[in-house]
Each structure stands twice: as C-alpha cells, then as structure tokens.
Amino acid sequence: MKNEKKKSGIEPKVFFPPLIIVGILCWLTVRDLDAANVVINAVFSYVTNVWGWAFEWYMVVMLFGWFWLVFGPYAKKRLGDEKPEFSTASWIFMMFASCTSAAVLFWGSIEIYYYISTPPFGLEPNSTGAKEIGLAYSLFHWGPLPWATYSFLSVAFAYFFFVRKMDVIRPSSTLVPLVGEKHAKGLFGTIVDNFYLVALIFAMGTSLGLATPLVTECMQWLFGIPHTLQLDAIIITCWIILNAICVACGLQKGVRIASDVRSYLSFLMLGWVFIVSGASFIMNYFTDSVGMLLMHLPRMLFYTDAIGKGGFPQGWTVFYWAWWVIYAIQMSIFLARISRGRTVRELCFGMVMGLTASTWILWTVLGSNTLLLMDKNILNIPQLIEQHGVARAIIETWAALPLSTATMWGFFILCFIATVTLINACSYTLAMSTCREVRDGEEPPLLVRIGWSVLVGIIGIVLLALGGLKPIQTAIIAGGCPLFFVNIMVTLSFIKDAKVHWKDK
C-alpha cells in the first residue's frame, strides 16, 4: 500500500519547478499590470524581430522531413504490430474533433479582419488586394505546412510508443538514443521536461484566456449579464469546480460524450453558417484563396519584411509558428496514440489531408462570413473592437446570422463544452506529466489534477486582466522558444534510433 502510494504520487523534480516559476510570474504580473505590459511588449519585439527567422526555417526543414518520411525508406514501416485500432473514418473524425477548440473558433472568426486591416506585402489596408490575400494567409497558417511538422513528431512518438515499447509521458523519455540514459534521466532530462511543462501551462492558460470571453460575451447577449473581468473569473472558477466534480465522481465518460457532442455540434454550426452566409461566395473565395496561396507560397514561407518593417510576419506568422511549436508535443502524443498499427506514410498523409481539411473548412466558412458582414456594412468590426473588445466583435459575427437567438444558443453551448473539455484535458495532461509512474488506463491523483486546473485558470485570468491580444501572443511566443529546441531534439533522437532499429533496405 505504501509503495502504491509512492508510485502514484507527484514527481517533485517536474512538479515543483513549473509550479514555482509560473506562480512567481503570475504574482509579478498582478503586482504591476502596467509594468508587466511594458515587459511583454519588449519580449514580443525581441523574440519576433531577432529570432523570427528561426521559426520560419524550422517549419521549412520539418516540411522537408515530412517528404522524407512519405517517400523515404521508412514510408512502409508499420507503427506497431497490430492492425489499426480505429477505422479510417473514425480516425479522421477524431482528428477533426481535436481541432474544434474554443480558441480555434476565436481565431477562425476574427483573424481575417486583422489580415485585411493590416495586410502583408505593403498592400493597402482594406483594399481588394488585401481581401484577396486575407483568407490565403489563413490557409497558409492553418494548412498543410504546420500539420506536416506535427506528422513528423507524431511518427516519432508513435515509433517510441509502439515500436520501441517505451512509456513516454514526458519528452525526456524519448531522448535516450540522442543523449544517453544517464543524461536523459538526469539533470538534462529534468530541465527539458520543465521547459516543456512551463510552456504547456502558459499555452493552456492562453487558450483559456481566448475561450472565456467568448462564453461571457454570449451570456451578455443571451441573458443581459454585463461582461466584466469578475464574470470571467467566476466562469473560470465554475469550470474548475465542474471539472473537479467530474473527476471526483468518475464522470470521465460524460466528459468524453461532451467531446463527441462538441464535434457534432461543430459540424452543425459550420453547416448552418455555410448555407445562410452564402455558399457560392464561400466556395468562390476559397478557390481564389487556394490560387493566391500557391502563387505566393515561396514568399510566405520566408517572409520577414526585413526592409519594409511592417510587422505582419512578426505579429502573425512567427506567432502562429510558435503556437504550433508549443502545442506540438502534446498534440503529437495524442495523434500518435490513435495511430497504432498504421504505416508511416498512412500517418503522414492522413494527418496532412484530414487535419488540413478540418482547419481549412473552419477558417474558410468563418472567415468568409466575417468578410461578407464587413463588405455589406452589416458590422463595423473596428468600432466593435475599440468599444467592446475582440470577443464582442466575434459574437456579433454569429449574432448577425438568421435565427440569431438559436444561432447564439448553439455557439454558446459549443464554446462552453469546448472549454470544459479543454480544462479537463489540461488537468489530465499536466497531472500525467508531473506524477510518478502513472500508466495508461490509470488516473493521476485527484488533487494534482485540480491543482493544475486551478493554476491554468489563474493564468487565464491574469492574461485577461492584462487586456488585448499582445499578452496572449507573447505568452505563446515566449513559451515556444524553449520548445523549439525540445522538438528538434525529439526529432533527432527518433532519426538516430530508427537508423538502428529500422535498418534501411
């Protein structure tokens, strides 16, 4: 009994350092919000301007890695001895479900406005050229390129899981082939794990910081409850309590059902927007945007605007590449676990095709709807953002649709469920990563899960208190920097080990 307790307890070397670091940063921020904003702007400017090029090269190199996996010597290697655990249709659907978070609904609805109002390549704001490139850039940031980078890491984790039979819950476990067991399980591995956990905590906090205002703005629209920071804090607290109840009462099956409901409701809501917003325009705009993407792809890949210094690639491309980097390990572990029994080529093609289709549908439908509302002068989005904030502008893009009350109820339920499942996933992932010897099928300790959900909630509230998108963007970029190196090490470790255990034929 005593040994069992020790077995399922926290791992101090990866539990306390992230807790202390994040706690201190939150305390310093709350002490002086104005000073924190000054630091945030300085960090954002330094990382994006000095190191933005590194993120762009990272994505390009990982894209070449994808081609190597698909057409190279390992293409037909199978990730595990068993047949695929899920049918291809179920597999693709699970991938789509992983894309329908509230943060995705946030960016999908409003991103195009920023691209049109502050366009790249020196284009005139709100011009025809800016509108033509707007959706194309969304398809670039949320298309095959980032999913190709994820597929490389997913193959790496699937290899360690199902071929090498390793129990990987932290990135240091995968580094044994690269740095040796002594370093992977020693101080070096501990530092790597702590980088991963601190970055992941901030990433999850930013997702919560994006999702919460959508729910509270829905409540204001539906029930007339004024949206305030206090209301945001109350809603986050309610979610944390709900998550604790679900975990304590063994209602995880209910959470999984809620996740399925979220996916089906996403299909329903997107279908509704597609039909009533203007299906023919959406398809024409999408087709045109794919052409624009293909025409400008080389420049987009390497665009740093070093001469014009307009700030577009730093504010968006580097930010999104950091977003993809920071979520890469967590997402790739999930995608690897549902891909047992598939070949390397199947996993790479399935991810790029299935997940690109998911994100392109989301961004095309929601972005086109926002553009139409702007062009028809139904919404004055700049005024809404200036007077009420970004979340209100997003809500109004949904409220402007026919049957607005029913539409808003659907959007409210979708955002609420998406955030409940987000907090549940956050607490589970962090608890699994900071506990000792928790195996698949076992639950990490209740108090640890609740503790992490509380900390993620606090970060979300702190980011909301800072106001605007810049703190959220900076948190992602700062967290993405250390993960940039961790992802590269995991990739190199896989390549080195595969050369031994998957000998070229």
Curated annotation (Swiss-Prot):
Record keyword Transcription regulation present: no
Keyword Transmembrane: yes
Alphabetized UniProt keyword annotations: Antiport, Cell inner membrane, Cell membrane, Membrane, Transmembrane, Transmembrane helix, Transport
Matches recorded under InterPro entries: BCCT_CS (IPR018093), BCCT_transptr (IPR000060), BCCT_transptr_CaiT (IPR023449)
A biological process term (GO) from this entry: carnitine metabolic process
Disulfide bond sites: none
Main location: membrane
Topology in membrane: Multi-pass membrane protein
Domain of life of the source: Bacteria
Task of the protein: Catalyzes the exchange of L-carnitine for gamma-butyrobetaine.
UniProt subunit comment: Homotrimer.
Gene: caiT
Pathway: Amine and polyamine metabolism; carnitine metabolism
Compartments it resides in: Cell inner membrane
Pfam families per the UniProt record, alphabetical: BCCT
Transmembrane intervals: 10-30, 51-71, 92-112, 143-163, 195-215, 231-251, 263-283, 316-336, 347-367, 403-423, 446-466, 475-495
Catalysis performed (reactions): 4-(trimethylamino)butanoate(in) + (R)-carnitine(out) = 4-(trimethylamino)butanoate(out) + (R)-carnitine(in)
Entry protein name: L-carnitine/gamma-butyrobetaine antiporter
UniProt similarity note: Belongs to the BCCT transporter (TC 2.A.15) family. CaiT subfamily.
An example Gene Ontology CC term for this record: plasma membrane
Gene Ontology molecular functions: (R)-carnitine:4-(trimethylammonio)butanoate antiporter activity; transmembrane transporter activity
